[in-house]
UniProtKB/Swiss-Prot annotation:
Localization: Cytoplasm
Function summary: Transfers the 4'-phosphopantetheine moiety from coenzyme A to a Ser of acyl-carrier-protein.
InterPro entries: 4-PPantetheinyl_Trfase_dom (IPR008278), 4-PPantetheinyl_Trfase_dom_sf (IPR037143), ACPS (IPR002582), Ppantetheine-prot_Trfase_dom (IPR004568)
Record protein name field: Holo-[acyl-carrier-protein] synthase
SUPFAM superfamilies: 4'-phosphopantetheinyl transferase
Biological source species: Salinispora tropica (strain ATCC BAA-916 / DSM 44818 / JCM 13857 / NBRC 105044 / CNB-440)
Binding positions for Mg(2+) per the UniProt entry: D8, E56
GO biological process: fatty acid biosynthetic process
Reaction it catalyzes: apo-[ACP] + CoA = holo-[ACP] + adenosine 3',5'-bisphosphate + H(+)
Lineage: Bacteria, Bacillati, Actinomycetota, Actinomycetes, Micromonosporales
Alphabetized Pfam families for the sequence: ACPS
Length: 122
């Protein structure tokens, strides 16, 4: 049963400027595993913007509760390279409160726009 659906879009150029203007912003928004590829290279602005859109989409799928920590929602590749969503702490508590225990995630970026769609199920 679907608990919620969230969709978000991010302008990549604007997001990249924000990351440049505020050097610690990436650390506040993303875990180390999100900021770097498996080989240790920094992720592209497009990739980070899509992950940020996913975090926003998760919050929307949960009804946009307050007090969620950015690090409590992590988007990293699964062994096959597909984006995988893991929740912990504040986000996991909000998910339990709403009965969400299964996630579907889609990320995309093209033409300067990054987007994400999340479906939360029980």
């Amino acid at each position: 049963m679907i608990v919620g659906v969230g969709i978000d879009v991010v302008l990549v150029e604007r997001f990249a400027r924000a990351l440049t203007r505020t050097p610690l912003l990436a650390d506040r928004l993303f875990t180390e595993a999100e900021r770097y590829t498996r080989s240790g290279n920094p992720r592209s602005p497009e990739s980070l913007a899509a992950r940020f859109a996913a975090k926003e989409a998760v919050a929307k799928a949960l009804g946009a509760p307050t007090g969620l920590s950015w690090h409590d929602c992590e988007i990293v590749p699964d062994p096959d390279g597909r984006p995988w969503l893991t929740v912990s702490g504040t986000v996991a508590a909000a998910a339990v409160e709403r009965g969400a225990n299964r996630w579907h995630l889609s990320l995309s970026h093209d033409g300067g726009i990054a987007s994400a769609m999340v479906v939360a199920e029980r």
